[in-house]
Design a protein with these regions (language model features):
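Structural signature of Gram-negative outer-membrane beta-barrels, strongest in the C-terminal barrel
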Residues: 265-267, 356-360, 364-366, 391-535, ...
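C-terminal beta-signal and adjacent terminal beta-strands/loops
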Residues: 116, 478, 538-539, 543-545, ...
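Outer-membrane beta-barrel domain signature, strongest for Gram-negative TonB-dependent receptors
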Residues: 246-370, 520, 524-526
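Membrane-embedded beta-barrel scaffold of Gram-negative outer-membrane proteins
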Residues: 192, 308-323, 471-475, 502-571, ...
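Short acidic/polar hinge/loop motifs at secondary-structure boundaries
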Residues: 111-153
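Periplasmic-side early beta-strands and strand-to-turn transitions of outer-membrane beta-barrels
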Residues: 185-191, 195-288
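Gram-negative outer-membrane beta-barrel transporters
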Residues: 350, 354, 407-413, 422, ...
Length: 747
């Protein structure tokens, strides 16, 4: 393993902690041991926490079953989904038909993820039959480092709710306490997973130590390394191989990740934590290198008025394209995204008679910069000026927020007020001479665009009885245009739109929670959440093609009077309607458990031309969710709960893809995917002892042939064309029956 910066910093700390272990364990013998307290729904199923919270919130635990990937876990959330793109190496969360930076605020340990990945198309390694590059915002994180994900739909408190139109998803990584066994000061956590049918393998090892310091403090640290082998040359349910499709070649990759943390508690009132995480991969014609460093602290003295939290972080992600890889005709390209954030907030609590209140107020700053390098020595000047690749610019967001919770009797009112200042900086090039008639302004200039948004929200809940809580809410959210939208470079200055406005949404929700224990059996627990939501989105941003039509522009290619054609982002003149139902169910007992979710949704959001690969450059993804979808997990606990058996049923309703070709007017065609069957997975976990857990599984037990909804390759321009039906076939089938095994070792 390569000793990088994280290793050099943390290894000495681990050694110091280990040297103190003997002394600490001797001291621990004098500490009184308390009786064991059983807490339901905090580790195996963290979602139980949300059945007593008003609003659309969900949580999922990670790494419970062997080789159950992040896409499957997030898609089990009502209202949640993912955009699948095997060429990006990350996870892209979709909430209520929305995805991408600002529409969904995706975070890791509270740090926003701003990476935009772009795959190559040249060099014979990828898209060998002409499929173009594809781009997608995604989160580069190793699943083995994760413990849970918390998803808020529609709105979230604090920094997670800033610049988040449809919601947020926060992935939580392992801490020292997740590695150490009870009363141990040094520990190791190791995971290994393997799947046949080219699912691949992955492994992780994490070392941690913790020692008492000063009078009531502690010093802990961890160092973790993970590596995977991933490929897409699998056998489909119909017996064919994925590699039979040329666009599925060149996807084998070996990502590796490092993570380190140092946590110092000088006393019981305060804590400081320094974290570092690095992700490296070589995928689809480019090297990816992403690093995040953060410092967080908290201070909570014996006062109801002070609960101070601080977080600052910097993330830098680089993409360097291989010498033999191309983006359309571009060579030797590279991109860099650097993000810095700062958040400071305090929580105050007070009571007056029957009224209790909680107020959280804070400030949040984010600086987000994108840059690219296209060497003039290797690229034609015209190709550089008209490259639909890696727009450059800066995005600054400054925010103030106030979140409150008021409780009086059976009533709970959660209210928020978020104020944000959006700023976009970049350069609008001068328009080409042929484009002057349609370009405004036609000259080149530096753009410095500012917008301001004030978003109030409120949720009122009624605790009618101990187990039943209905609630209603009104939420306003917004998001800034992204650099890639305002400074789109597909046709030099003509495709840049410096007049874009932020998106804003008004969302109404009505729902209820049921949360009760001892329902059917002693020590069982039941949770149910049902929510209806209705959103109206103003100034929705999307990408369209425009054509030269005499003295003006038009949207239909059949009306064009010259060869002028360009793509540009605009604000939709009509309000986008987004509505649906979300239901989540969880039941747990000593003998068996049930987890379920159901989503039904519809949206009038227009599809961006950029979602088409051949004609729209693949600059973004198609995000319309299936009409409805559901996940049901049934499980049993045997042998004194050492053996857990579970079956997962995944239902997907009618789903679409963006057509590979366009209609006669040059507009997007939406095509219905073939009916997707119910997919069944089986898993078994056996806890040999506190040190060893063995895992096995079978994915797609019935070996069904189907397409995953919202898979970017469903619309690959390299799909086979059927001349008899004048359509492109659906050949991007998912993985057939696959066997998995895994082990988790702790000591």
């Amino acid at each position: 393993m390569k000793f990088n910066t994280i290793t050099r910093i943390l290894l000495p700390v681990l050694c110091i902690v280990a040297s103190q272990t003997t002394f600490a364990e001797e001291k621990a013998k004098n500490i009184m041991e308390l009786d064991t307290v059983t807490v339901y729904g905090t580790v195996e199923n963290p979602n139980f926490e949300n059945f007593s919270k008003a609003g659309s919130v969900s949580s999922r635990a990670m790494n419970v079953n062997a080789m159950q990937n992040l896409d499957s876990i997030v898609r089990s959330v009502a209202g949640g989904y993912t955009q699948i793109d095997p060429g990006q190496g990350g996870v892209s969360v979709n909430i209520r038909n929305m995805s991408g930076l600002g529409r969904v605020n995706t975070l890791v340990d509270g740090v926003p993820q701003t990476q935009l990945g772009t795959s190559a198309n040249g060099g014979g390694k990828f898209h060998t039959d002409g499929n173009g590059p594809m781009s997608q915002f995604s989160t580069l994180i190793d699943q083995n480092f994760l413990t849970r994900v918390d998803i808020a739909k529609g709105y979230n408190n604090g920094a997670a709710g800033l610049n988040a139109l449809a919601g947020s998803a926060n992935f939580k990584t392992i801490d020292v306490e997740d590695i150490l066994l009870e009363q141990h000061k040094v520990g190791v956590l190791s995971r290994f997973n393997y799947g046949n049918n080219d699912l691949g393998k992955n492994g992780m090892i994490a070392l941690a130590g913790k020692v008492d310091v000063l009078e009531s403090g502690s010093l802990g640290s961890l160092l973790a390394f993970s590596k995977s082998s991933i490929s897409q040359n699998y056998r489909r349910g119909n017996g064919t191989m994925a590699s039979d499709s040329a666009y599925m070649q060149g996807l084998k990759n070996h990502p590796e990740s490092y993570m380190g943390k140092i946590a110092f508690k000088p006393n019981q009132d305060s804590e400081f934590k320094l974290s570092g995480r690095q992700y490296k991969n070589s995928l689809v014609g480019r090297n990816i290198d992403s690093a995040t460093y953060s410092l967080e602290s908290s201070y909570r003295p014996q006062s109801d008025w002070i609960d101070l939290k601080f977080l600052t972080a910097v993330t830098e992600t680089k993409q360097d394209f291989h010498d033999d890889a191309k983006l359309w005709t571009l060579e030797d390209a590279s991109t860099k995204n650097k993000m810095w954030m700062f958040d400071l907030n305090n929580t105050s609590r007070f009571e007056s008679g029957k009224l209790s209140a909680l107020l959280t107020y804070g400030v949040n700053l984010m600086r987000n910069k994108y840059s690219r390098d296209l060497p003039e020595s290797k690229n034609n000047d015209g190709a550089i000026r008209n490259a639909a690749f890696g727009p450059a610019g800066k995005q600054n967001i400054d925010s103030l927020y106030l979140d409150t919770e008021w409780k009086y009797g059976i009533f709970t009112l959660n209210s928020s007020l978020h104020y944000s200042r959006y700023q976009l900086k970049g350069y609008k090039p001068e328009c080409d001479s042929d484009d002057m008639d349609y370009c405004f302004p036609s000259f080149g200039f530096d753009v410095n665009k500012k917008h301001y948004k004030l978003n109030p929200s409120a949720t009122l809940a009624f605790q009618v009885v101990d187990w039943f809580q209905p609630f209603v809410s009104y939420k306003q959210t917004s998001r800034s245009p992204n650099v890639q939208e305002m400074f789109n470079t597909s046709r030099n200055g003509l495709s840049v739109n410096p007049f874009l406005k932020p998106e804003s949404a008004k969302t109404y929700e009505i729902g209820f929670n049921i949360h009760q224990d001892n329902v059917l059996l002693n020590n069982d627990i039941l949770g149910l959440k049902a929510v209806y939501f209705n959103s109206r989105i103003k100034d929705y941003l999307y990408n369209l093609s425009l054509y030269g039509c005499g003295p003006t522009v038009c949207r239909n290619s059949s009306d064009a009077t010259n060869a002028i054609q360009f793509q540009i982002y605009v604000n939709h003149p009509e309000k986008v309607k987004n509505r649906g139902w979300e239901v989540e169910l969880a039941y747990d007992s000593d003998a068996f458990f049930v987890n379920g979710s159901y989503t039904r949704t519809e949206s009038t959001a227009p599809t961006s031309k950029g979602a088409t690969i051949l004609y729209g450059f693949g600059t973004e993804a198609y995000t319309q969710l299936p009409k409805d979808y559901a996940t049901l997990e049934l499980g049993a606990k045997l042998l004194d709960k050492k053996l857990t058996l579970s079956s997962i049923f995944k239902y997907t309703g009618k789903a679409k893809r963006v057509g590979i070709d366009l209609d006669e007017d040059g507009n997007i065609i939406h095509e219905q995917l073939p009916n997707i069957p119910v997919i069944i997975d089986l898993y078994a976990n056996y806890k040999v002892n506190k040190h060893l857990t063995l895992k096995v599984g079978v994915q797609n037990v019935m070996n069904r042939n189907y397409l995953d909804a919202l898979n970017a390759y469903n619309s690959s321009s390299s799909e086979e064309y059927d001349s008899d039906t004048d359509t492109y076939r659906f050949t991007n089938s998912a993985r057939g029956r696959t066997y998995t095994l895994g082990a988790e070792v702790r000591f």
